[in-house]
């Protein structure tokens, strides 16, 4: 789902959709919160800035969409994808490169990186408990 957190950019793939979110949004935390909210509130949203374009992941109990904002809005329907499988994939992607994701939106401040790492870990634990 997400990979390659380098130089303030990463890769996002869902079905046939590909995006390149930037450091302007906290990609790992925003995704974790969207999935946690979907369990807790019945809906979750994560918005991503690609610096010139943007896209939004929308989760409901029965559907999953990406709204792509380029020249004109495009709606991608991923309702056939199993959300639990996607949650497991997200957790695996984050745990595979926790150091890279911890540094994604931070400067070289070691304390800030540690805090971000702890936040990601805590949210992973929360999501695992909900799956």
Q: How should these model regions be labeled?
A:
Residues 1-73, 77:
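N-terminal low-complexity, intrinsically disordered segments
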Residues 56-131:
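Long protein-protein interaction modules used by eukaryotic assembly/scaffold proteins
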């Amino acid at each position: 789902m997400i990979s390659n957190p380098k130089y303030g950019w990463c890769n996002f793939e869902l079905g046939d959709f590909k995006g390149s979110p930037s450091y302007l949004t906290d990609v790992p935390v925003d995704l974790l919160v969207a999935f946690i909210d979907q369990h807790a509130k019945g809906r979750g949203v994560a918005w991503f800035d690609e610096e010139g374009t943007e896209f939004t992941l929308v989760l409901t109990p029965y559907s999953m969409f990406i709204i792509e904002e380029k020249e004109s809005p495009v709606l991608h329907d991923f309702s056939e994808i199993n959300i639990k499988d996607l949650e497991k994939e997200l957790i695996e992607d984050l745990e595979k490169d926790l150091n890279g994701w911890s540094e994604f939106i931070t400067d070289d401040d070691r304390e800030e990186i540690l805090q971000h790492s702890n936040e990601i870990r805590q949210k992973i634990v929360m999501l695992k408990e909900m799956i």
